[in-house]
């Protein structure tokens, strides 16, 4: 395969589909989504067979349990994709929405209208359900999409993309707007990242290494987050039951995802009461606790921590995205120290405080500079679907207009629209002593 020819053709076709996407109605877009949902159910066994091939390959490669979990498309996750498609179909279409409109002193009416980004390339590892979620958002927001999944899910993704394209064909939607990089050759991605004449934005989802490589090589804008070092602070005025449930959920429920906590920060005045209790529950779940000296003093030889693996924390542990049943623990003297700790070690993803003190909670929200900040809730909610966005293209921690989970609106940009009635600037027009003559007769050939 000539990779350069293949990728340029693919990107060019995606770009050319944009002129057809501008004419597609909301009804057609919803029809594609709902037909895809039907086909996912009809072809459930075909999807599972393809996924089994990917899982067999991954097992031979010695992939971790956490990664194998992300690769898996079981009944529950297929049904989850079906629900995502229905949710996105039910959301308002952002394209063409007038964001604002005002009238200038000269009578011009100036406004902003949402329009698609254009061609969006998403590069992702593992999680084949991202194929359907990303495509659904691009379809509803009238963007062309280029899907590049990992080599470990190529069989699953191939089947899912064919289902999406079949739904597009049957619904009168431009099939070329759904492009799939059907090769495991890494040069395909490297070349696509140089095609800024066709691709408007790239969104990488995966490990920090992948995301940094994309950010360094791409010639088009990249919307990203490098890693999810999420922090939970247990304040001295925390409700104990809330604190234990949130700390447990945010680490244990699904440790391999970017919105799980990696650092547990505990105020010194509640540490002796809280740490042994959470250590007991973490121990039952198989969580390893990497503790600073103050936490070690509390937990060392404590009967409730007997079955918990507790080791001294290293400085680097607090920067680490473990994506596993490991948590780093820090005891602090104040909320000030907690906030400073988060700013030093966090990745601006998601942070939470557990406190019954409203003033402290609002201070935490105002001073912690992350894309999602919580009071008395688990960071595991940082997700497009949980936020009511239907699904998400990814999560951005960049200091740009798109920050946090990216839903439909985040896949559009504003276009200025201006309505006039012959206004000209500074009254510079045809000189008054010149007569404007308009020849309405047809020109003779």
UniProtKB/Swiss-Prot annotation:
Enzyme kind, highest EC tier: oxidoreductase
Function as written in the Swiss-Prot or TrEMBL entry: Catalyzes the NADPH-dependent reduction of L-glutamate 5-phosphate into L-glutamate 5-semialdehyde and phosphate. The product spontaneously undergoes cyclization to form 1-pyrroline-5-carboxylate.
UniProt-recorded name of the protein: Gamma-glutamyl phosphate reductase
UniProt key word Oxidoreductase: yes
Principal place of residence: cytoplasm
PROSITE patterns: PROA (PS01223)
Record GO biological process: L-proline biosynthetic process
Cellular localisation: Cytoplasm
Disulfide bonds: none
Keyword annotations of the record: Amino-acid biosynthesis, Cytoplasm, NADP, Oxidoreductase, Proline biosynthesis
Catalytic reaction(s) noted: L-glutamate 5-semialdehyde + phosphate + NADP(+) = L-glutamyl 5-phosphate + NADPH + H(+)
HAMAP family, per the entry: ProA (MF_00412)
Family stated for the protein in its record: Belongs to the gamma-glutamyl phosphate reductase family.
Source organism per UniProt: Persephonella marina (strain DSM 14350 / EX-H1)
GO CC aspect terms: cytoplasm
Annotated pathway: Amino-acid biosynthesis; L-proline biosynthesis; L-glutamate 5-semialdehyde from L-glutamate: step 2/2
GO molecular function, one term: NADP binding
Enzyme Commission number(s) from the entry: 1.2.1.41
InterPro entries assigned to the protein according to its UniProt record, in alphabetical order: Ald_DH/histidinol_DH, Ald_DH_C, Ald_DH_N, Aldehyde_DH_dom, G-glutamylP_reductase_CS, Glu-5-SA_DH, GPR_dom
């Amino acid at each position: 395969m000539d990779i350069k020819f293949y990728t340029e053709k693919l990107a060019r076709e995606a770009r050319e589909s944009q002129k057809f996407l501008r004419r597609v109605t909301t009804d057609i877009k919803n029809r594609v989504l709902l037909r895809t949902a039907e086909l996912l159910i009809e072809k459930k066994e075909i999807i599972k067979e393809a996924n089994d091939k990917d899982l067999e390959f991954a097992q031979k490669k010695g992939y971790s349990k956490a990664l194998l979990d992300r690769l898996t498309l079981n009944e529950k996750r297929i049904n989850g994709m079906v629900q995502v498609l229905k949710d996105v179909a039910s959301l308002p279409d952002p394209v063409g929405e007038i964001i604002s409109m005002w009238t200038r002193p000269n009578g011009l009416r100036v406004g902003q209208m949402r329009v698609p980004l254009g061609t969006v390339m998403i590069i992702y590892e593992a999680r084949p359900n991202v194929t359907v979620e990303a495509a659904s958002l691009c379809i509803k927001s009238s963007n062309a999409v280029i899907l590049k999944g990992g080599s470990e899910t190529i069989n699953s993704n191939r089947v899912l993309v064919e289902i999406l394209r079949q739904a597009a064909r049957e619904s009168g939607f431009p099939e070329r707007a759904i492009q799939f990089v059907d090769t495991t050759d890494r040069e395909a991605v490297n070349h696509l990242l140089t095609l800024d004449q066709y691709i408007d934005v790239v969104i990488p989802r995966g490990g920090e290494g992948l995301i940094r490589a994309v950010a360094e090589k791409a010639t088009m804008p990249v919307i990203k987050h490098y890693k999810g070092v999420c922090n939970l602070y247990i304040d001295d005025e925390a409700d104990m039951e809330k604190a234990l449930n949130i700390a447990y959920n945010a680490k244990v429920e699904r440790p391999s995802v970017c919105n799980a906590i990696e650092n547990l920060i505990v105020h010194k005045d509640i540490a002796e009461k809280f740490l042994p209790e959470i250590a007991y529950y973490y121990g039952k779940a198989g969580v390893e606790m990497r503790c600073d000296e103050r936490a070690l003093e509390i937990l060392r030889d404590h009967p409730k921590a007997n079955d918990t693996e507790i080791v001294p924390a290293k400085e680097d542990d607090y920067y680490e995205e473990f994506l596993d049943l490991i948590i780093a623990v820090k005891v602090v003297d104040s909320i000030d120290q907690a906030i400073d700790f988060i700013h030093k070690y966090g990745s601006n993803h998601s942070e939470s405080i557990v406190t019954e003190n409203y003033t402290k909670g609002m201070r935490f929200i105002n001073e912690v500079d992350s894309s999602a900040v919580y009071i008395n809730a688990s960071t595991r909610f940082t997700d497009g679907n949980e936020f009511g966005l239907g699904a998400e293209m990814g999560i951005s921690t960049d200091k740009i207009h798109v920050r946090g989970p990216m839903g439909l609106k985040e896949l559009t940009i504003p276009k200025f629209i201006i309505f006039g009635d012959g206004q000209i600037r500074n009254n510079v027009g045809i000189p008054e002593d010149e007569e404007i003559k308009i020849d309405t007769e047809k020109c003779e050939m």
